[in-house]
Amino acid sequence: MRHRFAFFAVLAALVLTAAGCAGDASSGQAAAPATTAAAPGPTTAPPTTHTETTRHAPEGLVPTGRREPAPGLRVTAFDGREIDLARWKGQPVVVNFFESWCVVCRAEQDALTEVSRRFEDQVRFVGVSNNDTVSEGRKYQREFEIHYPLANDSSGRTWAAWGVPYQPVTVVVDQRGRIAWRFDGGLEPGQLDPVLEYVVEV
């Protein structure tokens, strides 16, 4: 009887020991909480900045919405060429009303010749006299080395149509055949350049 009691006591001790080991093993194998890297927040691109360069219109330039169509201009150049303003539509045109004997016209001519060479690939130029003869016109053209055509309006109709009471008068016609700028009197050096730069670009 004593041996049977001892047997059960040993068996119970073994069972308790096994249960304790199992508990230790279970708690020892518990997984550590997973550590996940925080997802990066959405990156915001820096705002795009747009820089607008506003070119200020030169003094006297007519706003595009208020420009009037230029009168017709059909004249014969001193070299025999027929000049028709309508054929030049699509390009800006400078029309200079002058006389070869006019002191103010002669004073502005060097500056006018210079700007005409600067813009010769972008802008057409023509000079229109009122009463110069062919020989006078050609002499004036050679004297100032003018490469653009000069013509004579002996009838005075062109000057009248353009409202030119005296010389010199310079008119800039835009690509659509409208009057963009007009100056009555002698041009100063550099005065016409910003006008043409604006008309060509806008």
Where are these regions (language model features)?
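Extracellular mucin-like PTS domains
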Residues: 33-54
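Short active-site neighborhood of thiol/selenol oxidoreductases, capturing the structured segment around
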Residues: 83-106
